[in-house]
From Swiss-Prot:
The keyword Cytoplasm applies. It comes from Gallus gallus. Residues 445-468 are annotated as: Disordered. Its main location: membrane. It comes from the Eukaryota. The gene is MEAK7. It holds the Pfam family TLD. This is MTOR-associated protein MEAK7. Activates an alternative mTOR signaling to regulate cell proliferation and migration. Residues 252-420 form the TLDc domain. It is found in: Membrane; Cytoplasm; Lysosome. GO terms for biological process: positive regulation of protein localization to lysosome; regulation of cell migration; regulation of cell population proliferation; response to amino acid; response to insulin; response to nutrient levels; response to oxidative stress; TOR signaling. InterPro entries: TLDc_dom.
Length: 468
């Protein structure tokens, strides 16, 4: 290895802290062990290299084989001499270190040569179909390795929707961000046969942070390297939020890819934890029960499924309050999970972010987001089971299309998740209503004929910590 090559290698090595270097060295020694021991038997001082077979053997359980092959091709694409664009036969330690350095600590320009070769082993532009296959493999690998390493933080493949559809939906969403050289977005199905050069892919990786984050997860968790060191996983620490409150055999309307995508659009301070407040499967099909479980619980994600199978919802940035006025702020958004995955943010046209009303004769009663009275982007009627998503052509508040299969839909299931930490006003410590603490006070009220106005709209606070 010449001086220039040696200097480049040392520069990449210097990006790693001493304990990280030790981690990377140990991993390469493990991966190259079989080939080096064979060389030692022959009495030859051969340079250690890694083979595809060794990498496959190491990654057999943590990662799908297609992704292992892609990683190996990425490693082989590192040109140590600067003279050849061909893939090497084996992977040398210098290639391995530079590969890890570029993907984990590099910018979009440093990552792009590797990613191009992970997409296709042939040099030059890549087809849309090849990018789609790479993206689907990448998302599938993230779901697989997080499940395998038990890093889904309370979510499981059993308590969420089947991820197969979610993988395709998230892949399509990320691919929709591909921009051609003239700045226009490629449209399916033409996208599949189109060719994209290095500059387009580099721009895509730069603008779509999920690609780098997913590669980081696959490397750290797949190779089991640099995954436990402090400050090295900031980009992926809240990729999946902690899950609280799923009990029994409840299966969420979310799948793992959609949880990852929706969570990435929440304010950063809310991304670390989701807590199930209401599920129609668990708490029954009742609007008063819905209100009782979600009022004054902090920011929430609402998700519902209509009887045609469409899944969609919205993020409420403030605690829900029962009142005949709009509430919330411009951090609110609507989203679709199935048949397509997308997020629709505010337009600035109006401030009709979120609305919750119950028991009034002169104003609409129900839960709504976006649009206007009787013409909401998302509406769940207080006559539980009915709803609408009106958007001709788009919801004025969020620029969302019709989210349900039919404009007026029938509700099949509904969930509400509190996101982030519970607000102090909703915490149980010293905050119980006198009616919860003192049953005699409740009885006295009833004896004197006083009605409990909060009955049905206020959830009795349980003694156990339901946050665990």
């Amino acid at each position: 290895m010449g001086n220039a090559e040696s200097n480049a290698y040392r520069n990449h090595l210097s990006r790693f802290l001493p304990e990280e270097q030790s981690d990377v060295d140990g991993l390469f020694d493990t991966l190259s062990g079989s080939s080096s021991s064979a060389a030692a038997k022959n009495g030859k001082a051969m340079k250690k290299t890694m083979t595809l077979e060794a990498l496959k053997a190491y990654m057999r359980e943590p990662l799908p084989e297609q992704m292992t092959v892609r990683l190996y091709n990425g490693m082989r694409s590192i040109d140590l001499t600067g003279k050849s664009s061909a893939l090497s036969d084996h992977v040398a330690k210098e290639q391995f270190v530079i590969f890890m350095s570029n993907l984990l600590k590099g910018n979009a320009d440093e990552k792009i040569t590797i990613i191009m070769r992970m997409i296709s082993t042939t040099e030059g532009p890549v087809k849309g179909k090849e990018i789609q296959e790479f993206t689907e493999d990448l998302i599938k690998s993230v779901v697989h390795v997080l499940s395998y390493r038990k890093e889904l933080k309370g979510w499981t493949l059993e308590n969420t929707r089947d991820s197969a559809g979610g993988i395709k939906a998230l892949s399509s969403q990320l691919l929709s961000e591909l921009k051609l050289a003239d700045g226009t977005k490629a449209v399916s199905p033409q996208l599949m046969e189109m060719s994209f050069d290095r500059s387009v892919i580099e721009d895509w990786v730069y603008r779509v942070p999920q690609i780098s984050a997913f590669l980081s997860v696959v490397l750290r968790q797949g190779l089991h390297v640099l995954h436990s060191l402090p400050d090295q996983t900031k980009d992926i620490v809240n990729l999946v939020p902690g899950c609280k409150g799923i009990k029994g055999r409840i299966v969420s309307l979310f799948d793992i890819p959609s949880i990852i995508y929706i969570n990435s659009h929440l304010p950063a301070e809310l991304q670390h934890k989701w807590r199930l407040l209401f599920s129609s499967k668990l708490h029954g099909e009742s609007f008063s029960q819905l209100c009782a479980h979600i009022v004054n619980k902090g920011p929430c994600v609402v998700i519902l499924k209509d009887t045609d199978g469409f899944i969609f919802g919205g993020f409420a940035s403030h605690s829900w309050e029962v009142k005949p006025q709009f509430q919330g702020d411009n951090r609110c958004f609507l989203f679709s999970v199935f048949p397509s995955l997308a997020v629709y943010t505010y337009t600035g046209y109006n401030d009709h972010y979120m609305y919750l009303n119950h028991g009034q004769q002169t104003m609409p009663n129900g839960l709504g987001m976006g649009g206007q009275h009787d013409y909401f982007g998302l509406w769940v009627d207080s006559d539980y089971g009915k709803g609408h998503s009106k958007a001709k052509p788009r919801c004025t508040t969020y620029n969302s299309p019709q989210l349900s299969a039919k404009e007026n839909f029938t509700l099949d299931a509904l969930e509400v998740w509190a996101v982030g930490d519970m607000p102090e006003s909703a915490e149980t410590k010293g905050k119980k209503s006198i009616l919860d603490v003192d049953p005699e006070a409740q009885a006295l009220l009833e004896m004197t004929g006083k009605s409990r106005h909060s009955e049905g709209l206020r959830e009795p606070i349980e003694d156990e910590d339901d946050d665990n």
